UniProtKB/Swiss-Prot annotation:
Ni(2+) binds at residues 100, 102, 106, 145. Keywords: Amino-acid biosynthesis, Dioxygenase, Iron, Metal-binding, Methionine biosynthesis, Nickel, Oxidoreductase. SUPFAM superfamilies: RmlC-like cupins. The record marks 108 as: Important to generate the dianion. Its EC number is 1.13.11.54, 1.13.11.53. It comes from Bacillus subtilis (strain 168). Pathway: Amino-acid biosynthesis; L-methionine biosynthesis via salvage pathway; L-methionine from S-methyl-5-thio-alpha-D-ribose 1-phosphate: step 5/6. InterPro entries: ARD, ARD_bac, RmlC-like_jellyroll, RmlC_Cupin_sf. GO terms for biological process: L-methionine salvage from methylthioadenosine; L-methionine salvage from S-adenosylmethionine; methionine metabolic process. The record marks 105 as: May play a role in transmitting local conformational changes. This is Acireductone dioxygenase. Catalyzes 2 different reactions between oxygen and the acireductone 1,2-dihydroxy-3-keto-5-methylthiopentene (DHK-MTPene) depending upon the metal bound in the active site. Fe-containing acireductone dioxygenase (Fe-ARD) produces formate and 2-keto-4-methylthiobutyrate (KMTB), the alpha-ketoacid precursor of methionine in the methionine recycle pathway. Ni-containing acireductone dioxygenase (Ni-ARD) produces methylthiopropionate, carbon monoxide and formate, and does not lie on the methionine recycle pathway. Pfam families: ARD.
Length: 178
């Protein structure tokens, strides 16, 4: 279940799931919880995945992926896995931390591990969405944000796209608001 930390003077934290969902809805961020217990046990917390295992993850959540894709007009999906076993992890994380936006939604469903989306709210204040297995988030188009990992430095996520080509980040700044 996701938690929120607002980058305000009090570092306000929201942990109650109804309040998390309400806050994200007020920011026009889609947040859903999918039944992660459906994931086959041999894929839980596995970060070095074969193409067949990635397809098995997509097949497991096919109904949910089709549902949100129908509602939002998404056309493609894939599975990404990041962990310390990737020799380019630090380089990838540096690139991910560059604040950017897209001309379409950025959608992630966390399968294993953890991730953080840092999103600019409607009032200009940034907030963190700390995601756990079972959490789906859709950052709306043209909203400034970036993604990073939590302390465990590993995540498996389903990415869902509007086009079969995926999305292209548009960078506004080289510095990151943290």
């Amino acid at each position: 279940m996701a938690t929120i930390r607002i980058h305000d003077e009090a570092n306000t934290t929201i942990e109650n799931q109804e309040e998390v969902a309400s806050f994200l809805d007020s920011q026009e961020v889609i947040y859903e919880q999918w039944d992660i217990t459906r994931l086959p046990e041999h894929l839980s917390e596995k970060y070095d995945l074969t193409e067949e295992e990635k397809q098995q993850i997509l097949d497991t959540f096919e109904t949910e992926i089709k549902d949100i894709s129908t509602r939002r007009g998404y056309k493609a999906q894939d599975v990404i896995s990041l962990s310390d076993s990737n020799p380019k992890l630090d380089e990838l994380l540096e690139n991910f931390k560059r604040e950017h936006h897209h001309t379409d939604d950025e959608v992630r469903f966390i399968v294993s591990g953890h991730g953080i989306f840092v999103i600019q709210g409607q009032d200009g204040t940034f907030f963190d969405v700390r995601l756990n297995p079972g959490d789906l988030i859709s950052v709306p188009e043209n909203i400034r944000h970036y993604f990073t990992l939590q302390e465990d430095r590993k995540v498996v996520a389903v990415r869902i796209f509007v086009t079969t080509e995926g999305w292209v980040p548009i960078y506004e700044k080289d510095s990151v608001n943290q």
